[in-house]
């Protein structure tokens, strides 16, 4: 299973202003299309289309435990080597679940390739994470902390949260983004560094920028 397209509730102009190459309503990062559907389309990362789903998963836009998913038969787009901001690829998609085992079962049932479950808390307090390999990209599903589940009134379906991109020259990319990017720090993954886009960037979802895998 591989990612064809992500649909994000942002205006194309917002991404272009941050140094992404945008044509019409589409931005191709690596081999993934990002369709910028506008602020009126929803909130954040609305959904995705996947190639190679098992069975009838995604045939009619059915959710995978809350993650809006459609089946794609599209060929790979022509890859974009690098955007003006220096970003070259999508590293991973982040989703959050109140019940990690339930979400993992739904994703595996659709044919997604579970690589591992990390049974250690993250610095942000998430107790567990599951990682799925989707071609060159990763889906990271994060178990919501108990206090977050309590705040939202108990169990809820999984939802998309954010994106992480690869910037080989992270210092140059952060300099290009100026006040819209955070300071660079060590990532949780050993040997990698990370920065994030600030709210001033004006995007509809959290975005991280990372150095490539060492």
Indicate where each model-derived feature is located.
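Internal active-site segments that recognize and position negatively charged phosphoryl groups
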Residues: 88-108
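A structural feature that tracks compact, well-ordered secondary-structure segments
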Residues: 103-106, 140-154, 163-168, 175-176
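Extended intrinsically disordered, low-complexity coil regions enriched in Ser, Thr, Gly, Ala
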Residues: 9-28, 101-126, 154-159, 172-181
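General N-terminal targeting signals
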Residues: 112, 131, 149, 156, ...
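A short, structure-level motif marking secondary-structure boundaries and short turns
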Residues: 87-90, 157-159
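Vicinal oxygen chelate
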Residues: 1-10, 26-89, 117-144, 164-165, ...
